[in-house]
Amino acid sequence: MARLVGVDLPRDKRMEVALTYIYGIGRTRANEILEATGIERDLRTRDLTDDQLTHLRDYIEANLKVEGDLRREVQADIRRKMEIGCYQGLRHRRGLPVRGQRTKTNARTRKGPKRTIAGKKKAR
């Protein structure tokens, strides 16, 4: 099993898909990486040579922020917004949607399960 930046890549998947198992790399970025390193997209992870694996590892470490570094940066950005008190920071602090979605209905993922209000009756 190939290991890149602390992630075990699945052996039987094509490289284009296998790279997306790394946090911070999607399909587009995976294709850019493979093109830059000269590795075929259709090549399976199990068929990679040690040389190709080393080349991939060096390219990713030199040019991209992935996994732990990226997660830390995102968390730091959220924390900074909360500290300066901007609108997005307030939404994060209150656990509400940040990017303008409606909250009268829906938004259950961010708000959590419904809380029933005692004494409130449905209108007929």
Curated annotation (Swiss-Prot):
Q: What is this protein called?
A: Small ribosomal subunit protein uS13
**Keyword Ribosomal protein part of the UniProt annotation:** yes
Q: Name one GO cellular component term.
A: cytosol
Q: What is a GO molecular function of this protein?
A: tRNA binding
Record InterPro entries: Rbsml_uS13_C, Ribosomal_uS13, Ribosomal_uS13-like_H2TH, Ribosomal_uS13_bac-type, Ribosomal_uS13_CS
GO biological process terms, alphabetically, are:
translation
Q: What is the lineage of its organism?
A: Bacteria, Bacillati, Actinomycetota, Actinomycetes, Mycobacteriales
* Chain spans, region Disordered: 98-124
* UniProt entry tagged with the keyword Chloroplast: no
Its family remark reads: Belongs to the universal ribosomal protein uS13 family.
| Function, in words | Located at the top of the head of the 30S subunit, it contacts several helices of the 16S rRNA. In the 70S ribosome it contacts the 23S rRNA (bridge B1a) and protein L5 of the 50S subunit (bridge B1b), connecting the 2 subunits; these bridges are implicated in subunit movement. Contacts the tRNAs in the A and P-sites.
The record's note on quaternary structure and interaction partners says:
Part of the 30S ribosomal subunit. Forms a loose heterodimer with protein S19. Forms two bridges to the 50S subunit in the 70S ribosome.
The alphabetical list of record keywords is: Ribonucleoprotein, Ribosomal protein, RNA-binding, rRNA-binding, tRNA-binding
Organism of this sequence: Mycobacterium leprae (strain TN)
Which domain of life does the UniProt lineage start with?
Answer: Bacteria
